[in-house]
Curated annotation (Swiss-Prot):
PANTHER family: PECTATE LYASE SUPERFAMILY PROTEIN DOMAIN-CONTAINING PROTEIN-RELATED, POLYGALACTURONASE QRT3. It comes from Cochliobolus carbonum. CDD domains: GH55_beta13glucanase-like (cd23668). Keywords: Cell wall biogenesis/degradation, Glycoprotein, Glycosidase, Hydrolase, Signal. Glycans are attached at residues 28, 233, 381, 773. Its EC number is 3.2.1.58. It catalyses: Successive hydrolysis of beta-D-glucose units from the non-reducing ends of (1->3)-beta-D-glucans, releasing alpha-glucose. GO terms for biological process: cell wall organization. This is Glucan 1,3-beta-glucosidase.
Length: 788
């Protein structure tokens, strides 16, 4: 949730926006069957497997049997010659097929689209308007160029949620804007006059979204008002592998929480302008030749600061006058705002490392900053609060989590060097993906064949229903098409006392690696004994899941929608018991890597016109029992016992992680309708703890959290407990949300909570009261240390 002024957000842009007409609940798109012969021609083979294997994806719950999932912009009239205006062709490709467009619907899972852009230069004179559940993907072998015409008048060349020119209403509620991607593009705005508004991408975004491998080029004129990426709202999100040059701002961004990794910005006046946030993790920034690398001064020290916290790690700043410009002080308003932690930062020719309210508080030069911060501290052993501004005892980084001294990371594989002969098609192997047929045997056969032949298994878009465990052996590589879904169904998953995985990655004791990307795993009907994903492999470096999400209920075909599971307080329906555990990384499954994953038990129906709330019951969230685990850009929401549990786990990197407590709690109280069991190291609940834990650290060691947000917005569906107008900012949806039990060497930086009275409970003792850490809306701790 975010309660902010739209005008304030737009004012922060400093750029005049061109809006588009408002059209409430009217769909003027074409039907997939109405294209003329030229537009309906087969996609041109261009050497990239995603394009060359296209055509078999299906949207099984779409009313149009001819609905096209994959669209090549050249099939819709785009020329890519750098001369012809291709704007309309892009918008036709995106909107074709009565899809979920701005103001038309809140969300939809039955009209996905991959919009593919072959190599070439595409002149753009009107904004490209994004639709729900869309992936705009260029050819990574030779990145296509989207070149802004000099006459372009728009909020952004790619607009993720346009504003109406009639009443200013955005196309979508940004905090519910899920399931979208932009990949493999060059956006060139250099033809636009420096003083004319230009932004490459407008991207209000939430979970299960990403921008990856995008280059943005803008004017380097001193009077430029251009910005590369503008984000003014949302509950995100993830970006990686960006390269931005020029402009007033490389990025002008604000969001509840976000993770950015491997971002290069050069020759902007301000590299990154943080408009507002609750918390943000930046890793691998390379900012050079800018006036200010990173600004977080919005609101100022005398007023109400808009930035909650920022954590910046493993980054390099070169030839900038200032690294960080901040407004924090001992008397910051609110007291928990403006917090900053920087760690392992290499400066080259940067005179001022950190400036606060115009004064240099950390000198620069050419040096490496180990760990430094400012804000509220609870250390050692969660004692506090105390204000701090200066060097702090940084985390002792376990060597197994590092590569060349930095936390290990790996970008999502796109297999751009492979030909089509290196792939196996799930549909071609006999799976239907129609959401009705039992595809268990066909899917298992395809998975086994691909691994044995060292090929990549391509799941064309569809819903692949399975009634037994799909075993994923070491060596597997699997990739989906705009979130192809595997759906577990049936009695195999029916006994919560004897849980069974839907997806089993390796068997206990096995070693090896896998790569899995761009897919969803979901359940159908009552499956109280389902472990949605079980990870067992003792893995080599680089084995993991990228953009793989779990969606439990809230979508067509799941039988877990409004009709079956209405949000009636106190009415607990067994047919809506949907999973024992969402994701389990088991003992011995060391080396697992997760990036940009959303493990979600649905709180509302994505295919309902009014996004109506539903009651779905999942026992446990993300359970980690292994060592050397990386968790980048992760969310776990609405599980009855806990969202995250790190149980006897060691050497864990997590950032940014985010949770929400089930909206219906404490009716029924946790752990109901599930039963706590010592077999799974479940929490024991009491009358003083009636809602789920956001994060539970049980006998864990060396847990490093670089940005986290644990949120509780409701009490029995009453949002009043988290109201922005709560007296004195006291938001009391639940008493406590973070439990540290028997754990050592725990450190957290930029840690926020919403709706919680006590932010930390360590060894059964409540610590860190909300009132001492009230930030821009949540409560925030800059530095937490325990168990040293």
């Amino acid at each position: 949730m975010r309660f902010s002024s739209l005008l304030a957000c737009l004012g922060a842009v400093g750029i005049q926006a061109a809006a588009i007409p408002f059209q409430r609940r009217v769909d003027n798109t074409t039907d997939s069957g109405s294209l003329d012969a030229a537009q309906a021609a087969a996609a041109i083979v261009d050497g990239y497997w995603l394009n060359d294997l296209s055509g078999k994806g299906r949207a099984p719950f779409n009313s149009n049997p001819n609905y096209k999932v994959f669209r090549n912009v050249k099939d819709y009239g785009a020329k890519g010659d750098g001369v012809t205006d291709d704007s309309d062709a892009f918008n036709r490709a995106i909107s074709d097929g009565s899809r979920c467009g701005p103001w038309v619907c809140d969300s939809s899972t039955d009209s996905p689209a991959v919009v593919y852009v072959p190599s070439g230069t595409y002149l753009i004179n009107k904004p490209i308007i994004f639709y729900y559940m869309t992936a705009l993907i260029g050819n990574p072998r030779e990145l296509p160029v989207l070149k802004a015409a000099s006459s372009l008048q728009a909020l952004a060349l790619i607009d993720g949620s346009p504003y109406s020119n009639q009443n200013g209403e955005p196309g979508w509620i940004s905090t519910n804007l899920f399931l979208r991607q932009i990949r493999n593009l060059i956006i060139d705005g250099t033809a636009v006059a420096p003083t004319s508004g230009f932004q490459a991408i407008h991207w209000p975004a939430s979970q299960a979204t990403t921008i990856q491998n995008v280059k943005i080029r803008m004017t380097q004129a001193s009077n430029s008002v251009h910005a590369g990426i503008f984000v003014e709202n949302g509950s995100g999100g993830h970006m990686a592998d960006l390269d931005i040059t020029g402009g007033l701002y490389g990025m002008n961004i604000g969001n509840q929480q976000f993770t950015m990794r491997n971002v290069k910005i050069s020759k902007a006046v301000v590299g990154i302008s943080q408009i507002w946030n609750w918390g943000w993790l930046y890793s691998g920034l390379q900012i050079s030749d800018c006036g200010t690398a990173f600004s977080m001064v919005n609101g100022g020290s005398a007023g109400k600061q808009e930035v909650g916290s920022a954590v910046i790690i493993d980054s390099e700043i070169t030839n900038c006058q200032k690294f960080v410009d901040s407004a924090w002080s001992q008397t910051s308003n609110p007291t928990g705002s403006g917090q900053l932690v920087i760690e392992n930062i290499k400066l080259t020719n940067v005179p001022a490392a950190v400036v606060s309210n115009g004064a240099t508080v950390l000198a620069g030069g050419s040096l490496t900053i180990q760990t430094w911060g400012q804000g509220n501290k609870y250390a050692p052993n969660a004692s506090g609060p105390s204000k701090f501004q200066g060097a702090i005892s940084g985390a002792t980084r376990p060597t197994g989590l590092l590569q060349n001294g930095k936390f290990y990371s790996k970008s999502k594989p796109q297999y751009e060097t492979l030909s089509t002969s290196s792939f196996i098609s799930a549909r071609g192997a006999g799976a239907t993906g129609d959401g009705v047929t039992d595809d268990t045997r066909a899917v298992q056969a395809a998975v086994t064949q691909a691994a044995s032949q060292n090929k990549v298994l391509f799941f064309e878009h569809g819903v692949y229903k399975v009634t037994n465990t799909i075993y994923v052996p070491p060596g597997s590589r699997m990739v989906g098409e705009i979130f192809s879904a595997i759906m577990g169904s049936g009695s195999t998953f029916g006994d919560q006392a004897n849980p069974v995985p839907i997806i089993q990655i390796g068997k206990p004791g096995e070693s090896g690696s896998i790569e899995w990307s761009d897919m969803i795993v979901q359940t159908q009907g009552a499956t109280p004994g389902a472990i949605v994903i079980q990870y067992n492999l003792n893995t080599a470096l680089g084995s993991g899941l990228w953009d793989v999400h779990t969606r439990i209920g809230g979508a067509k075909g799941t039988n877990l929608q409004v009709a079956q599971c209405p949000a009636v307080l106190g009415q607990v329906k067994p047919e809506c018991f949907s999973a024992h555990t969402n994701v389990h990384v088991t003992k011995g499954a060391n080396g697992a890597y997760f990036e940009n994953n959303w493990f979600w038990t649905a709180d509302h129906d994505l295919d309902d016109a009014d996004s109506t709330r539903i009651n779905i019951y999942t026992g446990r969230g993300f359970h980690v029992e292994a060592n050397n685990v990386w968790i980048w850009a992760n969310g776990a929401e609405h599980h009855t016992m806990y969202q995250y549990q790190f149980n006897a786990a060691q050497d864990i990197f997590a950032g940014y992680i985010q949770t929400e407590t089930p909206y219906f709690q404490p009716t029924p109280i946790a752990p109901l309708p599930y039963v706590s069991s010592s077999k799974y190291s479940d929490p024991v609940y009491s009358s003083s703890q009636t809602s789920a834990w956001g994060l539970r650290l049980l006998d864990a060691k060396n847990v490093l959290i670089y940005g986290g947000g644990l949120y509780s917005f409701f009490d029995n569906y009453d949002v009043g407990c988290s109201s922005p107008t709560a007296p004195n900012g006291f938001r009391d949806c639940q008493t406590r949300i973070l439990s540290i039990e028997g754990s050592t060497s725990v450190q957290a930086f930029g840690f926020s909570e919403v709706g919680v009275e006590w932010m930390v409970t360590a060894a059964g003792q409540d610590k860190a009261n909300w009132k001492d850490n009230l930030s821009v809306y949540p409560t925030t701790i800059g530095y937490l240390s325990y168990g040293f």
